[in-house]
Amino acid sequence: MMNVLSLFDGISVAKQALDELGIENTYISAEIDKYAINVSEKNHEDILRLDDVRDIEARDFDEPIDLLVGGSPCQGFSLQGLQKGLEDERSGLVSEYIRLKNELQPTYFLLENTRMKQECKDFISESLNVQPIEINSIYFTGQSRNRLYWTNIPIGDIEPAHYVYNHDWSDGYRPGTTRKGPPRKIVFTEHFGCLTASYYKGIRADGRPLLTKVEGVFDEVKEHARMLTPEECEILQGLPIGYTSGISNTQRYKSLGNAFTLPVIKHIFEGLL
């Protein structure tokens, strides 16, 4: 039985990955977003739940932690954002992950975050004493999503996935936007850009937030671009369809945009077998 502590747990994709791999676990999560917790509780009733990571101390645990997982908020680090880095309160939470790793001394650890300025990357690497591995979700799903993974879990080679699209996806993705005038040029792309927590507000085809209208896939019937449905976003994240049902679509998009990509985490966790 593996004792797992997941910080900034979100919708518990790490738990889903462990369970799908058949790795028996006692899973403890720390999360404060009520909508993410709602999704997690619906899918994983056996999780032991804590609250704010800033209130957690090593003495809270009777048993050693075998695996420490974290995907600390990345908005301040993101190259697409304001790039406040560690000065951003959300990104500064990575220091809580580092603190608990030092206090708990887990056998294995995994920290995920977005691509960031070199100085921020160096700080995390020096604190964890390991260099990150960059993995794009495009090797596992139909989404281009680059993320950095700091871990001491041995990671095997990645074989690019092959996609078979059904009638709903037959022409792949056709990003296009409208403002108040006619539609802009529609282009074909084999993969969708990075799904973000702000997708419900609309995003650009390259994954950056879009503040006017939305891009998504091309609707053959209505003959214009539409947003992806929450179910399609679940597919892009490698999750079972309906995993995030039970909350509003806005919160589903947000929770999915903040989540791990399941097949990527499964690939990493295969090193625990």
Language model features with spans:
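Short pre-catalytic strand/loop immediately N-terminal to key active-site residues, enriched for Gly-Thr
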Residues: 248-254
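Acidic-aromatic/histidine active-site loop/patch
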Residues: 265
